[in-house]
């Protein structure tokens, strides 16, 4: 289904051409003065120079052609040369009827679907998820869902941090605590136990203890580095411990991501890319891409157009050790080999931009990816507390994600119990649903690249630009529809009608923009545009709700029109919140 702006533009292009002017001047936009009109065209102002004519004369010529169009109810030429447009109520109602009959609600699925690997999440194993992991998970999940909604094949990969010194530290500390474990017996050749030698709680305590000791005890650090080296070079017992670390961590991570309604198609980690590193290093050397500089192996990635210095991409340190660059490039090779994606999209902290510029340029220069494979970096800003500094616990520590979710759910529960007489058990369930909307909408309503303040009071409010306000609006619609059926009404033979008043038309105009908003949000990887849209849509619905008596309307046709409009508004809002990554309760 074509976007409504396209259909309006086609009509205006035709009028410009019939009036003897070029089509490229016929650009139509949403009106920036909705009190005067709904859409506008300022092309006459630009055309005046070309045609050596006063803009208002050109505007009048175009308007003369447009008055014959059935799309518009009102067309005006306004000084100095604006063309103001108002849509016909009949045309708008017909457009929404077609939209309501379309199973995709007017969304045109991609004609040439792309396969896109989405790298988001990125937690380290053996450590609990904390608030710093929130943005990548929420933004990545939303873009994955949006891509699928638009018809693309989206593959989400958590890309675990499961390699490097942290593993050696855990092995060393475990060896000190439980030296008799078979994993440390080099003569042992049997099967290793299926039961892990630690719980997630023990694992989360082992790592910080080991990390702290390594900073004070040089011999301990040396032992950890040696254990890391042995693990990376195939030590059988250490590989067995790594498997347990992954099993225990991933089980816990899945549980925590589930609370956020975030899921991944792939649970791969840095360790999965390791087998690709030796051949990649050899290839980069053999083909002259990599050279030795001060003992390290590097690839030059400067470009003539650079406005700031981009250092070479280091592949191996002078001691032969690999780095994040090495692992990320090997992961790109693995992804190209196994999945052949059209695009790999990284949802990562914006402070890592230089790292990804280096990796992407190296991958392109060394032909590790096809020429037309797109490598995209979506950098996000920091989630801060009210003091403008990164969000912390009250005593200044890093807040665990599960504690943040608990805190938000408690606040939502308190507000629900305060405002309504309701069953405590049901209120708890509702608080979880609404709490998730508070967290996700609070994050996604900000442009991804911007830092933002996580304000618990504001995000959990039922008023203003918040998740709970959006859900409250959806529940209000559901309750009207439920009441209609309880009173013996039917929702089967309803149909959108020509609008009767300004608030109804405003709601219909907002609904008609749904497909354009979703398409634009995907093109720009901008979930915040969906948030802005549904906030406007919720406001338009609530104005309509307060002005119109829906269920007590005596004119049966009008009432059916209102109910059809409610059904479409509910469906559009629910489609949007699904893409944003949360759901609505039945009652609030």
What is each PLM-predicted segment?
Residues 1-93, 107-588:
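Non-catalytic interaction-recognition regions
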Residues 101-106:
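A short, compositionally biased domain-edge/stem linker segment
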Residues 94-99:
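Short, charged, solvent-exposed linker or helix-capping segments at domain edges/interfaces
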């Amino acid at each position: 289904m074509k976007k409504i702006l396209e259909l309006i533009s086609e009509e205006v292009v035709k009028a410009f051409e019939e009036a003897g002017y070029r089509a490229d001047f016929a650009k139509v936009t949403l009106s920036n003065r909705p009190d005067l009109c709904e859409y506008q065209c300022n092309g006459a102002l630009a055309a005046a120079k070309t045609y050596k004519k006063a803009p208002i004369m050109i505007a009048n010529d175009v308007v003369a052609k447009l008055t014959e169009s059935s799309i518009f109810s009102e067309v005006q030429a306004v000084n100095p040369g604006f063309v103001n447009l108002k849509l016909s109520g009949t045309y708008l109602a017909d457009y929404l009827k077609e939209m309501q009959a379309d199973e995709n609600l007017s969304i045109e699925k991609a004609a040439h679907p792309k396969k896109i690997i989405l790298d988001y999440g990125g937690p380290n194993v053996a450590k609990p998820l904390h608030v710093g992991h929130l943005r990548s998970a929420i933004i990545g999940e939303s873009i994955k869902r949006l891509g699928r909604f638009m018809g693309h094949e989206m593959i989400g990969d958590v890309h675990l941090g499961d390699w490097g010194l942290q593993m050696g530290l855990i092995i060393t500390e475990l060896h000190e605590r439980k030296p008799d474990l078979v994993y440390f017996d080099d003569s042992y050749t049997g099967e290793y136990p299926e039961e892990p030698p630690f719980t997630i709680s023990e694992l989360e305590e082992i790592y910080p203890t080991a990390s702290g000791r390594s900073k004070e005890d040089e011999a301990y650090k040396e032992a950890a580095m040696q254990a890391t080296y042995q693990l990376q070079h195939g030590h059988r017992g250490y590989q067995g411990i790594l498997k347990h670390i992954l099993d225990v961590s991933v089980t816990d991570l899945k549980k925590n991501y589930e609370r956020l309604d975030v899921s991944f198609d792939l649970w791969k980690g840095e360790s999965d890319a390791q087998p690709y590193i030796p051949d990649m290093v050899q290839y980069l050397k053999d083909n002259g891409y990599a050279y030795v500089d001060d003992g390290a192996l590097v690839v030059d990635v400067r470009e003539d157009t650079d406005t700031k210095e981009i250092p070479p991409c280091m592949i191996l340190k002078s001691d032969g050790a690999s780095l994040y660059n090495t692992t990320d490039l090997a992961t790109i090779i693995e992804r190209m080999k196994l999945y052949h994606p059209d695009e790999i999209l990284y949802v990562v902290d914006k402070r890592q931009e230089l790292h990804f510029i280096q990796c992407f340029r190296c991958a392109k220069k060394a032909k590790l990816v096809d020429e037309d494979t797109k490598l995209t970096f979506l950098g996000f800003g920091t989630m801060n507390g009210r003091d403008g500094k990164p969000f912390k616990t009250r005593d200044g520590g890093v807040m665990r994600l599960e504690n943040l979710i608990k805190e938000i759910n408690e606040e939502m529960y308190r507000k629900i119990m305060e405002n309504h007489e309701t069953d405590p058990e049901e209120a708890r369930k509702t608080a979880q649903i609404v709490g998730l909307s508070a967290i996700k909408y609070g994050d996604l309503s900000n442009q991804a690249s911007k830092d933002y303040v996580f304000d618990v009071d504001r995000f959990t409010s039922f008023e203003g630009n918040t998740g709970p306000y959006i859900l409250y609006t959806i529940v209000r619609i559901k309750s009207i529809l439920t009441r209609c059926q309880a009173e013996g009404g039917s929702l089967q033979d309803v149909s959108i009608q020509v609008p009767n008043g300004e608030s109804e038309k405003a709601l219909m105009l907002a609904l008609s923009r749904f497909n354009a908003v979703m398409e634009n949000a995907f093109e720009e990887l901008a979930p915040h545009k969906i948030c802005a849209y549904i906030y406007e849509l919720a406001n338009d619905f609530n104005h309509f709700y307060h002005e119109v008596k829906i269920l007590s309307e005596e004119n049966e046709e009008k009432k059916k029109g209102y109910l059809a409009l409610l059904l479409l508004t509910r469906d559009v809002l629910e489609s949007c919140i699904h893409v944003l990554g949360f759901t609505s309760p039945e009652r609030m």
